[in-house]
């Protein structure tokens, strides 16, 4: 796909992610097992396709140091739309980028200890995880809710797959 052809699909992807906000980030632990945890997707900014913030001393950072491949999954219960993103994570402590992305609600996830900067945009424990998207698949529901419910019930009764939307594939 040309970059011109890719842009509309990427914009759809970003639009759906912004509506859902919380991702389940899956990493591979040192023992080879997969581990998922809820992460709030931050607003879009240059430097990575998707941004997340975390404390510096968490198991996910050890996971990412050993294997930077991640999967991000999103699900919107109301519409049954879902997104699966695979990508490569990069860690940064870039203070300018942290200041650019900082949101007041981060304070809840960075408990105050001895340092008065804790919870602020100057908290030295903050690490950004930038994810560069490799590929994504997402279902865009393009039917009104009553039609979606009808399709689900019809599928349940007939054994056919409900036709509730359009599947999109994005590959960079």
What are these regions (language model features)?
Residues 28-30, 55-57, 75-77, 86-90:
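Histidine- and/or cysteine-centered catalytic micro-motif in compact active-site loops
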Residues 37-40:
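Conserved beta-strand in the GNAT
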Residues 20-22, 48-50, 67-70, 123-126, ...:
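Short, surface-exposed beta-edge/turn micro-motifs
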Residues 2-22:
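Short, basic/aromatic recognition patches
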Residues 15-30, 70-74:
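A short, Trp-centered hydrophobic/proline-enriched beta-strand micro-motif
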Residues 1-6, 85-172:
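Charged, gly/pro-rich active-site loop segments
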Residues 42-80:
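A short mixed-secondary-structure module that forms the rim of ligand-binding clefts
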């Amino acid at each position: 796909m040309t970059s011109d052809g890719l842009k509309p699909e990427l914009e759809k992807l970003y639009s759906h992610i912004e509506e859902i906000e919380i991702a389940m980030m899956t990493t591979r632990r040192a023992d080879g097992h997969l581990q998922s945890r809820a992460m709030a997707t931050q607003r879009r900014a240059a430097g990575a396709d998707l941004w997340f913030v975390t404390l510096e001393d968490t198991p996910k950072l050890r996971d990412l140091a050993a294997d930077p491949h991640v999967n991000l999954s999103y699900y919107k219960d109301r519409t049954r739309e879902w997104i699966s993103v695979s990508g490569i994570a990069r860690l940064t402590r870039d203070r300018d980028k942290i200041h650019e992305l900082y949101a007041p609600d981060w304070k809840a996830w960075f408990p105050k200890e001895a340092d008065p900067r804790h919870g602020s945009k100057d908290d030295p424990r903050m690490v950004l995880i930038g994810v560069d998207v490799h590929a994504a698949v997402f279902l865009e529901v393009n039917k009104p809710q009553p039609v979606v419910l009808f399709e689900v019930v019809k599928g349940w009764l007939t054994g056919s797959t409900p036709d509730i939307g359009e599947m999109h594939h994005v590959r960079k």
